[in-house]
A protein has these predicted regions:
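Short, surface-exposed polybasic-aromatic patches that bind anionic ligands, especially phosphate groups
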Residues: 196
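Conserved ATP-driven motor cores of ASCE-family P-loop NTPases powering translocation/secretion/packaging/pilus
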Residues: 79-181
Length: 244
């Protein structure tokens, strides 16, 4: 057996590592959690010991279906410390309550340490409530008129300023599918259009554009290592190794 992931080298040069697990069978999901735990620890140590505190290449972890990989130990502390080492984690959840179910009281700490949050849509009550409160209120002008008729008719108008939720829970639940709400640290939340992936310069390289671009995992795993003239190898005689 040998290590072919080389997790500690991800911050040395531009590298893409894909961790793919079944979305219907959770038997081995704990492996993903273990990989992330080891990845964060190795990269933080290397950033401190080799590069003076920061990796030369930023490492971005896009953790889709974060709730399905199990608990990453001490994640609430890691998300607060990895940023200074040029490491970031993007947690993708269906609903915010998934995070609470796994990390309990530490869920709020994890969310609080995120520099940006994006809401793509949903109808889960807790998520909508938290988002509506985060957006705050706006000031609206309210006019009330009264008209009394009879022997002594009267007419009156009152004007007042009132606070109103910027977006209520029912408005968030029916948010346009092409819109999203983004909050960046130090900036008021704002409504934005979702990015059109078909406009990305590399879209033509995806399988959505052309099925010929689909990556065949089985074919890749079954590939044979090609040996070229001049390649050097270390030969170890197992019989000469000292016994344990």
């Amino acid at each position: 057996m040998y290590d072919e992931l080389h997790l500690d080298t991800l911050g040395d040069k531009k590298t893409a590592l894909f961790l793919i697990m079944s979305d219907t069978d959770s038997t081995f999901n704990f492996l993903i959690s273990m990989v992330y735990t080891q990845l964060f620890n190795l990269l933080c140590d290397k950033a401190d010991d080799v590069y003076g505190g920061k990796l030369p290449i930023h490492v971005r972890c896009l953790i889709d279906e974060c709730a399905n990989i199990g608990q990453v130990p001490n994640l609430e502390k890691l998300v607060a410390t990895i940023r200074s080492r040029e490491i970031s984690a993007c947690l993708v959840l269906q609903v915010r309550s998934q995070l609470k179910a796994i990390y309990k009281d530490n869920a709020d700490t994890i969310v609080g340490n995120m520099d940006s949050q994006i809401f793509l849509g949903g109808s889960e009550p807790t998520t909508l409530k938290d988002l509506s409160e985060m957006l705050g209120k706006e000031t609206i002008d309210a006019f009330n008129t009264s008209d009394t008729r009879g022997n002594s008719p009267s007419y009156g108008t009152t004007f007042q300023k009132m606070g109103h939720e910027l977006l209520s829970r029912d408005e968030l639940a029916v948010l346009d599918g092409g819109k999203c709400i983004l909050q960046l640290r130090g900036v008021r939340p704002f409504l934005s259009d979702k990015y059109d992936l078909t406009q990305h310069p590399n879209y033509k390289l995806t399988s959505d554009y052309d099925s010929k671009n689909t990556f065949d995992v089985e074919k890749y795993l079954n590939r044979k290592e090609k040996i070229h003239p001049g390649d050097e190898f270390i030969v170890v005689d197992a019989d000469s190794l000292p016994s344990a």
